[in-house]
Design a protein with these regions (language model features):
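Conserved ABC transporter NBD signature motif
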Residues: 426-434, 443
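Alpha-helical transmembrane segments in inner-membrane proteins
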Residues: 2-344
Length: 630
């Protein structure tokens, strides 16, 4: 694209790299701090051992027993359990788009604790019974909370479900402990408050096996988690196999929680506090948040446990009580709505001019008039029929407008065209092949769906939001390349949004958000663009500029465009063809002059309309008459 389009692209690229360097610095500092805390913790306890002796290896036999037999296993448990809980919290928060979704609040820790108590009371003779039953309890709690809380995609409902399940499981734990003898009751009570003093080699092995598996699995899915933070609807449209990612992350986070709780007891709030502090320091990218959370969680629990065993030595404090003293105030802070996270800086470059995207960056893969997407006699419905025998073909280089009243099935038709829904009969064909044969990533490489912007629960800049559109076109878990950033900046400029690049998405107006959503779709570099009410919340000037951009994309870059609108005159002005949808059936399809007649439009909208023609362009101009059709 010509350099005049974005005068601040160098600034934005530098800002993106600065963010990565900042995050890398955070991880390096945490790693160094963890090493220092590890060494210092070895020296602290009821019997002090000098650091010089530890580092030089000049230890007495008694000191070797203390270091290697008592302190080192405990320190390893603290590091492993802290890393596990922090990563589980980061994963739950990203997946569920809820900053309060840590294993404790969600009831996952309670499920793990209940399973562990069952293991302590009834299967203590089996060394792995406690971790395995703990994992089963965590998984069951996660599954039930998800089923109860995810309906309607309401974060408050999810938290409420977690509180209910946690309370229920807590009651079951109380009932079980009444059956325990005095010795088991004492052990269970102290363990529930966080106990790292009794970990066996089997428990340590299980914990670090879980941490290793969890780290690799969560990091491998970290790019998908970035998209899940914008909402499952958007993530699915951008190429994420949301069902697969959801269950992988759920199972992994449950494994991490179970491993930590079964080996170290109920150490609370680590999964809540640590990810937030990490995001505050390094941003919201889960490729950085997950490893940084592991180091920070390990550091927090190690420091808490060191304090627990040294503050009133030789007596000990429960480690979980110390982490709760840190976590509870943070939870109150979040509930009061004070959390804002790291906000993007205001962009310094000038306002974009809305020019079309560079041909050098948008390599057209089709020729004008080529049939791209074919809705072949599709019907769809649930308890009642929504669409019936729809036949519609979208060709490269054309703009098709879909008109109809509310409830006619327009959005359902778009979701079928995007592969989000499967028809009850008929087929959606992409260049002659059934769309169901393609993966979500393959579909997102060809088809972009633009819906209304969803509310975000984590601070993302507009540039970060648009970069999510590059998911389908890039492989692996690497960071955004200079080309990805350049394409994102160009799509922001094309939608007249470059001045928003470093602003928080949630700080934008509804119309500004809608333009950024379109920029994200363009960053997918699709061949088909499906737009659901693209001009909603836009002022008149931006309605025209956006649809002019859409027309240019079709005519200059051979995209196929299908857009839903209630703006009849905008459809007449910008569409090459118009489809009229009434009660789930297409009643007319053709160029605007053929379709946009007074009779057809009046029948469609059940309102008397008049059609005139522009004296220069000859395009239809629709006005409303008084009175309704009887």
């Amino acid at each position: 694209m010509a350099s005049k389009v974005i005068t601040n692209s160098g600034v934005e690229l530098s800002s993106a790299y600065l963010t990565k360097r900042r995050a890398a610095l955070v991880i390096a500092v945490l790693f160094f701090a963890l090493i220092c805390a590890f060494i210092i913790s070895l020296s602290l306890g009821s019997e002090h051992i000098s650091l010089a002796n530890i580092l030089s290896g000049s230890l007495s036999r008694e000191q070797e027993v203390i270091i290697f037999g008592l302190r080192l296993p405990r320190i390893i448990l603290a590091i492993g359990s802290g890393a596990a809980l922090a990563m589980a919290g980061a994963a739950f928060q990203a997946l569920l788009r809820n900053p309060l979704a840590d294993p404790y609040v969600l009831g996952v820790s309670s499920g793990a604790a209940l399973g562990a108590i069952v293991g302590i009371m009834f299967a203590s003779q089996f060394s792995l019974a406690r971790p395995l039953l703990s994992f089963a309890g965590a998984s069951a709690a996660t599954f039930v909370v998800y089923l109860l809380g995810r309906r309607g995609d309401d974060p408050a409902r999810l938290i409420l479900a977690g509180v209910v399940i946690s309370t229920l499981l807590g009651s079951l734990m109380v009932l079980l402990t009444t059956l325990a003898d005095d010795l088991k009751l004492r052990n269970i009570t102290f363990w529930l408050l966080g106990d790292l003093s009794s970990g066996s080699s089997e428990f340590i092995a299980f914990l670090f096996f879980a941490v290793a598996i969890g780290t690799v699995t969560l990091f491998a899915n970290s790019r998908a988690l970035n998209l899940m933070m914008t909402g499952e609807r958007d993530a699915f449209a951008l190429g994420v196999e949301t069902n697969r990612v959801r269950w992988i992350v759920f199972i992994t986070a449950s494994l991490l929680t179970a491993a930590a709780v079964s080996t170290s007891g109920a150490i609370g709030y680590v999964g809540l506090v640590v990810p937030h502090l990490v995001r505050l320091a390094s941003g919201t990218d889960n490729r950085l948040v997950i490893p940084a959370s592991a180091f920070a969680g390990a550091l927090l629990v190690l420091l808490a446990d060191t304090t627990a065993r040294t503050a009133i030595a030789p007596r000990e404090l429960p480690t979980g009580a110390i982490t709760a003293l840190i976590g509870a105030p943070v939870l109150v802070y979040l509930l009061l709505g004070k959390w804002k996270g790291r906000q993007g800086e205001t962009a310094t470059g000038r306002r974009g001019e809305g020019e079309i995207i560079s041909s050098a960056l948008w390599n057209s893969r089709s020729v004008a008039g080529q049939a791209l997407l074919h809705l072949n006699n599709i019907s769809f419905g649930y308890s009642h029929q929504i669409l019936a025998h729809i036949n519609l073909e979208i060709k490269s280089g054309e703009v098709v407008a879909l008109l109809g009243q509310n409830g006619a099935g327009k959005s359902t038709l778009l979701n079928l065209a995007a592969g989000k829904l499967l028809p009850n009969s008929g087929a959606v064909l992409w260049q002659g092949k059934n769309i169901s044969e393609f993966s979500r990533r393959e579909i997102a490489q060809q088809i972009a769906l633009v819906a209304q912007a969803e509310e975000l629960h984590f601070p993302l800049t507009a540039l970060e939001y648009v970069l999510a559109g590059r998911f389908a076109q890039t492989a692996g878990i690497g960071f955004d390349s200079p080309l990805d950033i350049e394409i994102a900046l160009q799509t922001l400029a094309a939608t007249d949004s470059s001045q928003f690049a470093n602003r928080s998405f949630d700080q934008l107006s509804s119309g500004e958000k809608q333009r950024v959503v379109l920029a994200r779709a363009l960053a997918q570099q699709p061949q088909i663009l499906l737009l659901d009410e693209p001009t909603a919340n836009l002022d008149l000037a931006h309605q025209f500029s956006l649809l002019e951009l859409v027309r240019q994309l079709a005519h200059q870059h051979q995209l196929g465009i299908l857009f839903v609108t209630h703006e009849i005159n905008l459809a007449a002005e910008f569409a090459d063809r118009v489809a009229l949808l009434k009660h789930g059936k297409i009643i007319a399809l053709g160029n605007p002059d053929e379709v946009m007649t007074a009779d057809l439009l009046s029948n469609l909208f059940e309102t008397k309309l008049s059609v005139n023609h522009h004296p220069t362009t000859g395009k239809p101009i629709i006005t409303i008459n008084t009175g309704n059709i009887n």
